[in-house]
Amino acid sequence: MSLLTEVETYVLSIVPSGPLKAEIAQRLEDVFAGKNTDLEALMEWLKTRPILSPLTKGILGFVFTLTVPSERGLQRRRFVQNALNGNGDPNNMDRAVKLYRKLKREITFHGAKEVALSYSTGALASCMGLIYNRMGTVTTEVAFGLVCATCEQIADSQHRSHRQMVTTTNPLIRHENRMVLASTTAKAMEQMAGSSEQAAEAMEVASQARHMVQAMRTIGTHPSSSAGLKDDLLENLQAYQKRMGVQMQRFK
């Protein structure tokens, strides 16, 4: 796996799924391929994106700044600086300085990532802030190691929280989660279906599922009534894909 592929993988792992994630993935690909060279416009676009947390925006802004060639005197953006200040905690700043000194001695991406993984997310963000604000310089490869270590920590905590939700025994939360998943699967089916004739059936199934979820939410139903809803949808989706000769495993 190339360095930029690895960076893209880690950064996208902390972006919530949805149309915005696809948009960000495209922007990252363009930036890494040297197709997008207008850093100012890119940062303005990033600043106004909804849903993303300030820290995620800060990390993306840092990656764009590292990658897109820009004029020397280009102004640093406040929304990135605020996100990478370690919540203003002086302890984070102290640790960030110690980490920065260690990173100065590293020359490889993996070496930097290993060193960074032993620090807290706040210290890692502060260290990115130091580099972003030009208070310190490291090689691009080392900076990317720092980015990926930060993303790994964030993704780990998101995964723990997601696992807690999936394994919860609370029937109401499980019921709502099944309905949300059915709804998002239906949306994905509609997007994939396109305008071909064979797509009509998939669209119909997706539409029925969405109406069913709406009705269940409106009238209120027993928590077990949603069991199997998403699985039925996925079965329909896979049958449709086979007929279309498409094999997409990513909805499993």
From Swiss-Prot:
SUPFAM superfamilies for the chain: Influenza virus matrix protein M1
Region described as Membrane-binding: spans on this chain: 1-164
Record InterPro entries: Flu_matrix_M1 (IPR036039), Flu_matrix_M1_C (IPR013188), Flu_matrix_M1_N (IPR001561), Flu_matrix_M1_N_sub1 (IPR015423), Flu_matrix_M1_N_sub2 (IPR015799), INFV_M1 (IPR037533)
Motif (Nuclear localization signal): 101-105
Keywords per UniProt: Host nucleus, Membrane, RNA-binding, Viral matrix protein, Virion
Membrane topology according to the record: Peripheral membrane protein
Locations listed in the record: Virion membrane; Host nucleus
Domain of life: Viruses
Gene Ontology terms for molecular function: RNA binding; structural constituent of virion
GO terms classed as biological process: viral budding from plasma membrane
Pfam families on file: Flu_M1 (PF00598), Flu_M1_C (PF08289)
A Gene Ontology cellular-component term: membrane
Region listing for RNP-binding, in residue ranges: 165-252
Assembly and interaction partners: Homodimer and homomultimer. Interacts with NEP. Binds ribonucleocapsid by both interacting with genomic RNA and NP protein. May interact with HA and NA. Cannot bind NP without genomic RNA.
Family: Belongs to the influenza viruses Matrix protein M1 family.
Additional remarks: Most abundant protein in virion. When expressed alone can form virus-like particles in transfected cells.
Function according to Swiss-Prot or TrEMBL: Plays critical roles in virus replication, from virus entry and uncoating to assembly and budding of the virus particle. M1 binding to ribonucleocapsids (RNPs) in nucleus seems to inhibit viral transcription. Interaction of viral NEP with M1-RNP is thought to promote nuclear export of the complex, which is targeted to the virion assembly site at the apical plasma membrane in polarized epithelial cells. Interactions with NA and HA may bring M1, a non-raft-associated protein, into lipid rafts. Forms a continuous shell on the inner side of the lipid bilayer in virion, where it binds the RNP.
Record's protein name: Matrix protein 1
Organism per entry: Influenza A virus (strain A/Chicken/Victoria/1/1985 H7N7)
Gene name of this polypeptide: M
